[in-house]
Amino acid sequence: MKDERRPICEVVAESIERLIIDGVLKVGQPLPSERRLCEKLGFSRSALREGLTVLRGRGIIETAQGRDSRVARLNRVQDTSPLIHLFSTQPRTLYDLLDVRALLEGESARLAATLGTQADFVVITRCYEKMLAASENNKEISLIEHAQLDHAFHLAICQASHNQVLVFTLQSLTDLMFNSVFASVNNLYHRPQQKKQIDRQHARIYNAVLQRLPHVAQRAARDHVRTVKKNLHDIELEGHHLIRSAVPLEMNLS
């Protein structure tokens, strides 16, 4: 809604921010065309461009040379951060991260089961089916690819929560989250019993979300991460060293 008392650029910027918070505009996806945004928001092209300039200045919208504008990733922990270093050198950091994942992903699954749209479920299903196909062609898929598919499945559920603070929180920890998934894949996927357990738990999460069973989905997601934590801890108790190499996600995207 237009406000005569405020600069038009601020009004436009706030309208676009609301689309981001509501999940209409998603992190990393190209923005709709200027024409479509103008039609949706009811502003002129010149006003829209002024608003986008404000958002670029705030770091909310980014435009790479020769590419479309998109919603920026907010507050991401970079692969050079102290947390990434601690992840690869200090055993407790992995377990602390898994505790955080259990809380955040449990809530993501609960909200996704409650608020997820059919379009969200299509994305989740696509990610789940790709993950299943990779498991069936185990010898042809690298561990990093397995981890990417696993991470994408959990991220799709998070995005279906439509809680943008939760989405931004998880995305700000993308490299850390991916490395916890990679640690799980690297240390557990070659153990048949643990791999079957992970597959069953992924199926429970998927089915509970799509069947709109929020509390079942929350419990399934939490149990999954906590089981991974226990299995990794058991490996260390057996006297084996965990593989916990820090691998920035963006360096491994195909």
Curated annotation (Swiss-Prot):
Organism per entry: Escherichia coli (strain K12)
A single GO molecular function term of this UniProt record: DNA-binding transcription factor activity
BP term (GO), one: regulation of DNA-templated transcription
CDD domains from the UniProt entry: WHTH_GntR (cd07377)
Annotated function: Transcriptional activator of the glcDEFGB operon which is associated with glycolate utilization, and encodes malate synthase G and the genes needed for glycolate oxidase activity. Also negatively regulates the transcription of its own gene. Glycolate acts as an effector, but GlcC can also use acetate as an alternative effector.
Domain HTH gntR-type: start-end pairs: 6-74
The name this protein goes by in its record: Glc operon transcriptional activator
SUPFAM superfamilies in the record: GntR ligand-binding domain-like, Winged helix' DNA-binding domain
Pfam family, one: FCD
Phenotype on disruption: Abolishes both glycolate oxidase and malate synthase G activities. Is unable to grow on glycolate as the sole source of carbon, in contrast to wild type.
Keyword Acyltransferase annotated: no
Record keywords: Activator, DNA-binding, Repressor, Transcription, Transcription regulation
Upregulation: Is constitutively expressed. Is repressed by the presence of glycolate. GlcC exerts an autogenous repression on its own gene.
